[in-house]
């Protein structure tokens, strides 16, 4: 088993790093517990943008490009942000990066800080549930965005992603397509939704949800049907798979890219591989691996479907074989809990975000 060291550490945040997202052109987005977002240019390992995206902790980040990123915060907002290119290709000095966050905390901002922060503007936002720690899920291929239900944390709402391009709307509620998805009557009690993910295969969209009860549920719908408003979700989404595979709340669910599997982790010490069920005939029993490490709260699969990376409560990242689930490496650097992980598309570059406010970068396999 390999025990590597990080080749670089990013130190821009002043609070716990809670979410990470790569885009393919060497850009990394990071969000923290105070609602701050930073856009990093990894070609020079320097920040290009910083802004206060939310007034509370950031739950999720989805980078579309170096100019567009979605964020989900505990302040009841999902927002899309547009970033202006850095003036003259300039980057923000680390000292100024920290000063901006401190100035905002003290309600004082200098002219230089305001210039930097104003290079980012909000293109659209809508209100959502803040009673859960579950982040959103986005699928540009399906044109869908999924979040916990506005009122009931045990249910899910589906929104149109592309409809949110209308920045003149003032209702702040988004275009909700289906609402209150839940696995009843197959499962009566699931507890709150803990993690969600979306995947498109052929003309089907698969929505997987991990619940507080330890259940993992796969819903499936035709892409065309899911993109239309329907007040009865049962007419659009079908439960194809519902299994209680964890003894503790599910912390993360993630799809492989093209290997026909999805993976889940939990507050227990198991990682579970599930077959993607496009029909009830394709249902197979899940495969579990006891890792001996409870609380692997973020899973990510590399774009070649060969490795799986986790971020753990014990401050360690771990690399597993996506096929065998065997542990291949331990990423040991952080002094506190690792909250999030990300893998750059088409690369072996891994990022880990921690409660110690640092982001470690690794190149492995």
Curated annotation (Swiss-Prot):
WD repeats lie at residues 12-50, 53-91, 188-230, 245-284, 292-330, 333-365. It is found in: Nucleus. Keywords: Chromatin regulator, Nucleus, Repeat, WD repeat. One of its GO terms (biological process) is chromatin organization. The keyword ATP-binding does not apply. Pfam families: WD40 (PF00400). It comes from the Eukaryota. InterPro entries: WD40/YVTN_repeat-like_dom_sf (IPR015943), WD40_repeat_dom_sf (IPR036322), WD40_rpt (IPR001680). The keyword Repeat applies. One of its GO terms (cellular component) is TTT Hsp90 cochaperone complex. SMART domains: WD40. Belongs to the WD repeat ASA1 family. Component of the ASTRA complex involved in chromatin remodeling. Component of the ASTRA chromatin remodeling machinery complex. This is ASTRA-associated protein 1. It comes from Schizosaccharomyces japonicus (strain yFS275 / FY16936) (Fission yeast).
């Amino acid at each position: 088993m390999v025990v590597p060291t990080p080749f670089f550490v990013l130190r821009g945040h002043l609070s716990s790093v809670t979410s990470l997202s790569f885009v393919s052109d060497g850009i990394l987005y990071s969000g923290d517990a105070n609602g701050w977002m930073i856009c990093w240019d990894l070609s020079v390992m320097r920040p290009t943008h910083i802004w206060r995206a939310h007034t509370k902790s950031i739950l999720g980040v989805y980078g579309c490009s170096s100019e567009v990123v979605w964020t989900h915060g505990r302040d009841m907002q999902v927002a899309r942000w547009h970033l202006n290119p850095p003036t003259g290709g300039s980057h923000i000095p680390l000292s100024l990066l920290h000063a901006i966050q401190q100035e905002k905390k003290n309600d004082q901002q200098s002219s230089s800080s305001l210039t930097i922060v104003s290079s980012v503007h909000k293109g659209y936002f809508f209100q959502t549930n803040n009673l859960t720690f579950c982040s959103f899920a986005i699928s540009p291929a399906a044109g869908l965005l999924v979040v916990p239900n506005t009122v009931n944390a045990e249910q899910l709402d589906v929104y149109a992603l592309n409809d949110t391009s209308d920045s003149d709307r003032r209702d702040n509620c988004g275009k909700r397509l289906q609402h209150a998805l839940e696995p009843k009557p197959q499962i009566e009690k699931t507890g709150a939704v803990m993690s969600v993910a979306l995947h498109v295969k052929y003309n089907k969209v698969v929505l997987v949800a991990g619940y507080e009860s330890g259940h993992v549920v796969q819903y499936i719908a035709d892409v065309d049907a899911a993109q239309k408003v329907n007040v009865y979700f049962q007419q659009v989404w079908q439960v194809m798979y519902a299994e209680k595979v964890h003894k503790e709340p599910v912390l993360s669910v993630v799809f492989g890219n093209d290997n026909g599997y999805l993976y889940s982790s939990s507050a227990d010490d198991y990682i579970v591989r599930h077959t993607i069920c496009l029909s009830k005939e394709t249902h197979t029993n899940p495969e579990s691996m006891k890792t001996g490490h409870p609380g692997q709260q973020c899973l990510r699969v590399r774009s070649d479907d060969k490795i799986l990376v986790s971020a753990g409560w014990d401050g360690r990242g771990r690399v597993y074989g996506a096929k065998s689930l065997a542990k291949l490496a331990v990423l040991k650097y952080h002094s506190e809990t690792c909250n999030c992980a990300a893998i750059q598309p088409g690369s072996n570059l891994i990022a880990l975000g921690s409660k110690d406010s640092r982001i470690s970068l690794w190149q492995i396999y």
